[in-house]
Every structure is written in C-alpha cells, then in structure tokens.
Amino acid sequence: PFTFDEWGKGNVNNNRQETKHLSRAVTYEGEALYRKEVNVPETFKGKRLFLHVERTKKTTVFVDGKKIGSCDNVQTPHRYDLTEFLFPGKHTLTISVDNSRRHYPAGVFNSHAFTEHTQTNWNGMLGKIFLEAVSDPFVESVKLVPEPEKKSVTVCLTIRNSYKPETARI
C-alpha cells in the first residue's frame, strides 16, 4: 500500500504553515500507473481469479496491456474478475489510479472523500491489495438488510457456480 504523499512525489506544497486544515508536503492530482509482474501458479488453474484493491480512487485494470475494466467507487473496495485473462505463467498487471476531479460529481468535492479538512484528495492504494483464487461454487456477494422493528435480518446471497450445476437449499 502506498500513496504519492508517502513517496513524497507530486507538487511541493510551499504553504505548510496552514493550521485550518491538513497541510500536505506534496499534492498530486491525475492518473498514476502501477505495474507488477505476477506469476500465476499451476494450482490456480480452473479457479476464479479476483483482484482486490481495498481503498483507492478511480481504478482501471489491465492484464498484459488489455483493458479489463474500471471502477470509480470511493466508498467500497474494488474487485475485478480476472479469470478470463490470467492463466498459469507470467503476466503484467497494471492498475491506473486516477484521482482527477472530472471523474466525480461536483457535490463530492466538499465531502470527507476529498476535502483538505479530513483526508485530502490523495492518490494511491491503501489497505489490502491481492489476487484471490476461488473454487466453484463461491459466494459472490452478501447483503444484510436489518429490520429492527421485527428484530430480524434478511441475508441476500449471490452464489456463483460457473462449471457444474448444483442444487442447494438454504
């Protein structure tokens, strides 16, 4: 995990005496590319492969130069299904992180996700970043819907099984 602030990369902030909000040493707004060579082991063959990026701004993911997809959600982790693009062997994984304001509605800029009073408009990736190999069937998503007046919770699951049909009762 890293940010431009931690690396000291970007435009030098000469107004470090500011006391009304956060005062960063450097600022950066725009696209940044992060590349890593990954070696997918034979043990991943036949499994679903997901890339997880826990905390970031807008991302676009590429495998061996081919665009896989984008996510601009700043509230939840980004998850990409790379199953069709990764197979055993070496691959180049590229993640574009772009904190440019053009990707977000104007109303977001005074929210905690961007203001210099709370966390700033940082660029980078924080938290866990990992590839996950999952066997079928697997839980794709979980949603909990609380109903306090009934003292109950409804659980909504999406279970995927892409290789063989199975019947289950929950």
Regions found by a protein language model. Name each.
Residues P1-N15, T92, S96, S100-H103:
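Accessory carbohydrate-binding/adhesion or oligomerization-edge regions at the termini
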Residues N14-N15, K20, A113:
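Hydrophobic alpha-helical segments, principally membrane-spanning helices and signal/leader peptides
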Residues E18-H21, Y28-E31, Y80, L144, ...:
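Extracellular/oxidizing-compartment recognition motifs
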Residues H21-R24, I170:
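Low-complexity, intrinsically disordered short segments enriched for Gly/Pro and polybasic residues
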Residues R24-F138, S162-Y163:
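Accessory beta-strand-rich segments of carbohydrate-active enzymes
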Residues V61-V63, S152-I170:
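Beta-strand-rich binding/interaction modules
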Residues V145-K151:
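Short, solvent-exposed loop/linker segments at the N-terminal edge
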